[in-house]
Curated annotation (Swiss-Prot):
Native organism: Nitrosomonas eutropha (strain DSM 101675 / C91 / Nm57)
Region Disordered, residue ranges: 1-23
Gene Ontology molecular function, alphabetical: structural constituent of ribosome
Compositionally biased tracts (Polar residues): 10-20
The entry's keywords: Ribonucleoprotein, Ribosomal protein
Family, as annotated: Belongs to the bacterial ribosomal protein bL33 family.
GO cellular component, one term: cytosolic large ribosomal subunit
Name of this chain's protein: Large ribosomal subunit protein bL33
NCBIfam families: PRK00504.1, PRK00595.1, rpmG_bact
Keyword flag Ribonucleoprotein: yes
């Protein structure tokens, strides 16, 4: 089953993306490089819990 997750910016801007992931196939935490519109550059986004 796919679960909803939050990808939070490592730039400290508070910006985040939401997405889904299959926790059984990928149990480790997700890290992606995505665009942060607040910082106006590409930064690492790390998986956190969606509340």
């Amino acid at each position: 089953m796919r679960e909803k997750i939050k990808l939070e910016s490592s730039a400290g801007t508070g910006h985040f993306y939401t997405t889904t992931k299959n926790k059984r196939a990928n149990p480790e935490k997700l890290e992606l490089k995505k665009f942060d519109p607040v910082a106006r550059k590409h930064v690492m986004y790390k998986e956190t819990k969606l509340k």
